[in-house]
């Protein structure tokens, strides 16, 4: 397995929220990403999703802060989305009609970069063969298993 674990958009969203069981586990995951940068990756579609969700909910002031903080945290670990990623996502859509287009784009990017694990509260990832979803609520159990060797 690749040591780079994909961080989905709901991790920074929950970490910035209030009064939700996912808040502290997601905040811990972001602290882990800060301390062990080589262990985590995300993609530009996550940034777009953050912008979309906060603007659509009328909470763009907070959303801008969340977006900027996550982009800064992940600065050189945000993968682009290429045409080949979208073509693979389209193929996956034929096989997995219940999985959102965004999640399929993430899955395609993950395949390109060799990442098999995704940290997400979104159970749709459970329906994508070859991916292992790590629920943020289980960070106590799986937390040390995602860290790259040699402290990076």
Could you say what each language-model-derived stretch is?
Residues 51, 55-77:
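Active-site-proximal, substrate-binding regions of enzyme catalytic domains
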Residues 8, 103, 122:
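Acidic active-site catalytic centers that drive phospho-/nucleotidyl reactions
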Residues 35-37, 73, 95, 128:
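Structured helix-beta-strand junction loops
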Residues 1-42, 55-64, 140-152:
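Short, well-structured N-terminal submotif of metal-dependent ribonuclease cores
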Residues 2-4, 107, 112-152:
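Acidic, PIN/NYN-like endoribonuclease modules and their adjacent C-terminal/linker elements
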Residues 16, 54, 93, 129-132:
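Short, flexible helix/strand-to-coil boundary loops that buttress conserved ligand/catalytic motifs
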Residues 11, 49-50, 88:
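A general alpha-helix detector
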Residues 76-119:
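Active-site neighborhoods of divalent-metal-dependent phosphate/nucleic-acid chemistry enzymes
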């Amino acid at each position: 397995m690749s040591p780079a674990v994909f961080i989905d958009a709901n991790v920074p969203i929950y970490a910035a929220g209030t009064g939700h069981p996912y808040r502290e586990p997601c905040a811990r995951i972001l602290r882990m990403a800060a301390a062990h940068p080589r262990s985590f990756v995300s993609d530009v579609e996550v940034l777009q999703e953050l912008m979309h969700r906060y603007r659509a909910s009328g909470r763009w002031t907070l959303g801008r802060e969340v977006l900027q903080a996550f982009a800064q945290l992940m600065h050189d670990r945000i993968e682009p989305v290429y045409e080949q990623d979208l073509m693979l996502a389209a193929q996956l859509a034929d096989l997995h009609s219940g999985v959102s287009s965004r999640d399929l784009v993430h899955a395609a990017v993950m395949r390109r970069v060799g990442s098999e694990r995704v940290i997400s509260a979104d159970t749709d990832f459970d329906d994508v063969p070859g991916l292992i979803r790590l629920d943020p609520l289980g960070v106590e159990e799986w937390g040390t298993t995602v860290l790259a060797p040699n402290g990076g």
